[in-house]
Swiss-Prot record:
This protein is located at the 30S-50S ribosomal subunit interface and may play a role in the structure and function of the aminoacyl-tRNA binding site. It comes from Mycolicibacterium smegmatis (strain ATCC 700084 / mc(2)155). One of its GO terms (cellular component) is cytosolic large ribosomal subunit. It comes from the Bacteria. Pfam families: Ribosomal_L19 (PF01245). This is Large ribosomal subunit protein bL19. Keywords: Ribonucleoprotein, Ribosomal protein. The keyword Ribonucleoprotein applies. Belongs to the bacterial ribosomal protein bL19 family.
């Protein structure tokens, strides 16, 4: 192991639940506005997980007032308070970019049994 691995190991979080693309999650993000800090919830479908180690990221997509919103989060970010997995999705792809073109019921993902 080199020196960077030791530094990265100290920054890794161990309270992250296991989730994969297709899962619906609530990401509780710490937002700082001026001197106040609050928790903002971003609920959506995980469309990708990418990378590994300290640089691992995941992207969550949701529809807000008819407009698609995607947000990418580092998995081990200190700005993430916690992640709740609401439903497990049954998908056959690792990257769900095809959901960007789908609207309404066609964008639904089957739930795992």
């Amino acid at each position: 192991m080199n020196t960077l691995d030791f530094v990265d190991q100290a920054s890794l979080r161990d309270d992250i639940p296991t989730f994969s693309p297709g899962d619906t999650v609530n990401v509780h993000v710490k937002v700082i506005e001026g001197s106040k800090e609050r928790i903002q919830v971003f609920k959506g479908v995980v469309i990708r997980r990418q990378g590994g180690g300290i640089s691992e990221t995941f992207t969550v997509r949701k529809e807000s007032y008819g407009v698609g919103v995607e947000r990418t989060f580092p998995v081990h970010s200190p700005n993430i308070d916690h992640i709740d997995v609401l439903t497990r999705g049954d998908v056959r792809r690792a990257k769900l970019y095809y959901l960007r073109e789908l609207r309404g019921k066609k964008a639904k993902i089957k739930e795992k049994r």
